[in-house]
Amino acid sequence: AVSIIQGIHALEQLGVDVDYVEAGVDTSKYYPALVDMCEKGYDLILTISSNNDDALVQVAEEYPDQKFINLDDEMTEPPANVYIMGTKNNEMSFLAGAAGALKAAELGEDKIGFVGGMDIPGINEFLVGYIEGAQAVNPDIKVATSYVGSFTDTAKGKENALLLYNSGLSVIFAAAGQSGLGVIDAAVAQGKFVIGVDSDQAEALKDSKPEMANVVITSAIKNIPENAVKAVDRAMKGEIPYGTREVFGIAEDAVGIAENEFYEKLLDEKDRKQVEELKMKVVGGE
């Protein structure tokens, strides 16, 4: 939610008049919200996430002259008036895995954890990148995995994380939406560490819940504000290939990891340099 609001402010600075509706996680609200926006006659409607795919496809068919951009979706064959921006989740999670493995090494451990929201392809893309990144710095590292079964169950997220922490590891990558807050809560309780997802979770928590921010080594982030500005700028220039999905990664600055004060505090400088070297290899196509 924080990154989306940042995106709105960034668009306003671009000189675009922006209105928005927060539909939350209740999928029944997506269709009426999209219809209402179509009826108001906006030049362009932005959405985010694959949770609203059914509603988006239906509304796009009902309003064929309305243009839509989804800033973060897995849909591969969108309607002719819909453009999908995808992100290379495996690239940002690759860096997260490297950071996690290096932190584990600092602690004398060769095992890290992963808590996913659900056992689905989009989340498993995070897992694959995480494992590959960890193995890039320690080929013998072990990765313990767990799925919450929900993106909104913080209690279950905490329960799963506690089981992993109690198995003898100290670092968990939480790709679990709101359930990930339960993982962070477990880290605080156990004196362990977390890698966040989607947005800079330490930055989002540092004022309201500093004890939680202090256990977030970094976050695998999607640069939604920047991606929104780039997409709208292209739309204004008539350069958007509607009816297609394009995927962007580290090279396009569409994804990355949070390099903030907590990252500098919780990961040694030599290890941060190693993560940066791996990042440059990804940018170079290695």
Which ranges hold each PLM region?
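A residue-level marker of the well-folded mature domains of exported/periplasmic proteins
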Residues: 1-286
